[in-house]
C-alpha cells in the first residue's frame, strides 16, 4: 500500500517547484552568505503587513505558539513554519503507523520528501482559509470575497517562499535548515526584546519599561524605596522580570550540559588493520525534532478548537475540546484556553498556577513526556537514523563495531539507539516542562529549541573548521 501511495503522488511531485542540488561543493563562506540571504528574506516577510486586512487587534489565539512557530501576526509570516512542520508530522505518523512504507532507496526518500512538500502546500491553503473565515482579520462578509481571496493568496505565496527557503538550506546551499534558522532567530529576538525592550506599558504601578533589565535601572532611578524597587524588578507580574531572565539563562546552561551526554561505540575499519574510531550516540539522539512535532500537534489542535468555538460556542463536544477566553492583563491581546482538552495540554502560566490546579500540571507533564518520547522513537524509523540505517551506513564505509561481526551490528545498535531516542525525547520534554514552571522567557519549548539549534550551528562551524584547518581559511 505504501509504494502505491508514493507512486500515486509521483505525478504531482513532478510539477512542484524544486531547488536543484548543487553541482559542486559549496564553500563555507558561500553557505554563510546564502544563510544570511535566507534569514534576511524571512525577516523582511515578518515586517510586511498583509494587504486587505480590516483588523488584527482581536485576541490572538496563537499568541503562545508564535515564538515556536516563527510566525508574526498580521504579516506575510502569519503562518510561519506551521505548514512545513504539520506536513512533516502527518507524514511521520503515516509512516510510523505503517500506513505508508518508505523504502531505503533514494527514489523512495525523494518521493517521501515530495509528498511532504505537497502536503505542506495543501496545509498552507487550508490554514489560510481557516484564518480568514474565522474572522482573524475582520468579518469575511464585510471584507468581501475578493479581499478574502487576496489574503489567502498572500498567505499561500508566503508559505511557498518558506518551503523553498527551507529546501534551499537543506539541499546544502546554506547551514542547517530553514526551520531551525527561523525558530532560533524568532526566539532569540523575543529574549533580547524581553530583556532590553524600550517600549513603555501603563500598569497599576505606573509607567514601566517592558524590558526586564531596562526596567531594573528605571525602577532604581525613579523609586525612593530601593528595596521595593528591586523586589518589583525581580518579581513584577504580567511583564518580563529578572527572575524570568535568570530562569532562561539557567535553562540554557542545563540544556548545553546535557548536550554533552553521549555513548561512544568503538568501531574499526574492515579494510585497514589498526584504524580505529568511535561512533557517538548522543542523549539527544533526535535533537529537537520531538519538541517541534509536539508543538505542531498542539498548534493544530488550537486552530481546530478556535475555529469550532467561534462557530459553535455552545456545543458540548466543542467545549470539551477547548473553551477560550481573552486575556485581561496588560500586553498584546491574546486568547488562552480556560477549559477542555486544550487547557490541559497547555503549560501552566506560573508555578503558582501549578499549585492552584495540580491536575492540570500532572496531565501537562504526562502529555509532554509521552508525546516527546513517542515522536522521538518514531522519527528514527522515517529519518534514516534507526539501528538498521546506521549499520548500513557503517557497512558502506567499510567500518564494523569492534568485537562484533557485520551480521550482529544491527542487534548491538538496537541496544542503544531506540533507548537513546526514547529517553532523549523524555529528557527534552522534561526540560521543556521545567523551563515552563520556572517561567523562562519565550516558553520552555522555545528556550529548548533555541539552545539545541544554536548548539547544532556550533557543531557545524566546528566541523567546517576542522575540514579547512584554520579560522582564516574558513571565512576568507
Swiss-Prot record:
Tell me yes or no: is Endoplasmic reticulum among this UniProt entry's keywords: yes
NCBIfam families xrefs: 3a0501s007, PRK08568.1-5
Q: Name one matching Pfam family.
A: Plug_translocon
| Residue ranges that the UniProt entry lists as topological domain Lumenal | 54-76, 139-144, 194-240, 310-354, 442-445
Keywords (A to Z) from UniProt:
Developmental protein, Endoplasmic reticulum, Membrane, Protein transport, Translocation, Transmembrane, Transmembrane helix, Transport
> What name is this protein filed under?
Protein transport protein Sec61 subunit alpha
Spans within the Cytoplasmic topological domain: 2-33, 97-117, 166-172, 262-288, 376-420, 463-476
Q: Which Gene3D superfamilies match?
A: SecY subunit domain (1.10.3370.10)
Q: Where in the cell is it found?
A: Endoplasmic reticulum membrane
Per the record, the similarity remark reads: Belongs to the SecY/SEC61-alpha family.
InterPro entries for this protein: SecY/SEC61-alpha, SecY_CS, SecY_dom_sf, Translocon_Sec61/SecY_plug_dom
State its role.
Component of SEC61 channel-forming translocon complex that mediates transport of signal peptide-containing precursor polypeptides across the endoplasmic reticulum (ER). Forms a ribosome receptor and a gated pore in the ER membrane, both functions required for cotranslational translocation of nascent polypeptides. May cooperate with auxiliary protein SEC62, SEC63 and HSPA5/BiP to enable post-translational transport of small presecretory proteins.
Regarding the membrane, this protein is recorded as: Multi-pass membrane protein
Q: Which GO terms describe its cellular component?
A: endoplasmic reticulum membrane
Q: Which cysteines are joined by disulfide bonds?
A: none
Instruction: Kindly state the subunit structure of this protein.
Output: The SEC61 channel-forming translocon complex consists of channel-forming core components SEC61A1, SEC61B and SEC61G and different auxiliary components such as SEC62 and SEC63. The SEC61 channel associates with the multi-pass translocon (MPT) complex.
Q: Which residues are listed as membrane-spanning?
A: 34-53, 77-96, 118-138, 145-165, 173-193, 241-261, 289-309, 355-375, 421-441, 446-462
GO biological process terms on file: pronephric nephron development; protein targeting to ER; protein transport
Amino acid at each position: 500500500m505504501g509504494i502505491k501511495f508514493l507512486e500515486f503522488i509521483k505525478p504531482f511531485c513532478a510539477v512542484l517547484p524544486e531547488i536543484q542540488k548543487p553541482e559542486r561543493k559549496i564553500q563555507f563562506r558561500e553557505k554563510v552568505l546564502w544563510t544570511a540571504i535566507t534569514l534576511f528574506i524571512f525577516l523582511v516577510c515578518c515586517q510586511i503587513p498583509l494587504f486587505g486586512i480590516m483588523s488584527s487587534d482581536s485576541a490572538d489565539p496563537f499568541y503562545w505558539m508564535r515564538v515556536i512557530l516563527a510566525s508574526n501576526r498580521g504579516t506575510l509570516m502569519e503562518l510561519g513554519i506551521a505548514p512545513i512542520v504539520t506536513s512533516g508530522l502527518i507524514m511521520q505518523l503515516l509512516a510510523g503507523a505503517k500506513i505508508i512504507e518508505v523504502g531505503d532507496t533514494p527514489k523512495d526518500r525523494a518521493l517521501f520528501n515530495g509528498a511532504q512538500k505537497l502536503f505542506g502546500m495543501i496545509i498552507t491553503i487550508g490554514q489560510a482559509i481557516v484564518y480568514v473565515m474565522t474572522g482573524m482579520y475582520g468579518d469575511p462578509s464585510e471584507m468581501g470575497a475578493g479581499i478574502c481571496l487576496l489574503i489567502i493568496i498572500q498567505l499561500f505565496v508566503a508559505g511557498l517562499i518558506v518551503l523553498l527557503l527551507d529546501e534551499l538550506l537543506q539541499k546544502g546551499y546554506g547551514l542547517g535548515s530553514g526551520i531551525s534558522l527561523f525558530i532560533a532567530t524568532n526566539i532569540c529576538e523575543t529574549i533580547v526584546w524581553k530583556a532590553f525592550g524600550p517600549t513603555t506599558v501603563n500598569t497599576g504601578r505606573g509607567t514601566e519599561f517592558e524590558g526586564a533589565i531596562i526596567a531594573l535601572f528605571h525602577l532604581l532611578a525613579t523609586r525612593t524605596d530601593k528595596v521595593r524597587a528591586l523586589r518589583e524588578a525581580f518579581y513584577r507580574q504580567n511583564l518580563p522580570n529578572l527572575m524570568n531572565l535568570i530562569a532562561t539563562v539557567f535553562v540554557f546552561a542545563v540544556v548545553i550540559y546535557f548536550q554533552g551526554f553521549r555513548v561512544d561505540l568503538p568501531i574499526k575499519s574492515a579494510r585497514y588493520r589498526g584504524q580505529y574510531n568511535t561512533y557517538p550516540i548522543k542523549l539527544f539522539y533526535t535533537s529537537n525534532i520531538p519538541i517541534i512535532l509536539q508543538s505542531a500537534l498542539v498548534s493544530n489542535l488550537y486552530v481546530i478548537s478556535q475555529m469550532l468555538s467561534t462557530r459553535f460556542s455552545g456545543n458540548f463536544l466543542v467545549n470539551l475540546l477547548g473553551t477560550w477566553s481573552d486575556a485581561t492583563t496588560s500586553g498584546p491581546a491574546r486568547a488562552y484556553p480556560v477549559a477542555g482538552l486544550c487547557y490541559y495540554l497547555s503549560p501552566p502560566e506560573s508555578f503558582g498556577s501549578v499549585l492552584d490546579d495540580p491536575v492540570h500540571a500532572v496531565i501537562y507533564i504526562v502529555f509532554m513526556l509521552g508525546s516527546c518520547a513517542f515522536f522521538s522513537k518514531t522519527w528514527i524509523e522515517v529519518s534514516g537514523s534507526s539501528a538498521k540505517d546506521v549499520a548500513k551506513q557503517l557497512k558502506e564505509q567499510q567500518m564494523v563495531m569492534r568485537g562484533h561481526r557485520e551480521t550482529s551490528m544491527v542487534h548491538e545498535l538496537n541496544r542503544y539507539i531506540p533507548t537513546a531516542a526514547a529517553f532523549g525525547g523524555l529528557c527534552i520534554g522534561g526540560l521543556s516542562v521545567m523551563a515552563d514552571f520556572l517561567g523562562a522567557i519565550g516558553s520552555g519549548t522555545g528556550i529548548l529549541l533555541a539552545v539545541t539549534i544554536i548548539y547544532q550551528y556550533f557543531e557545524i562551524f566546528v566541523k567546517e573548521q576542522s575540514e579547512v584547518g584554520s579560522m582564516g581559511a574558513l571565512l576568507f
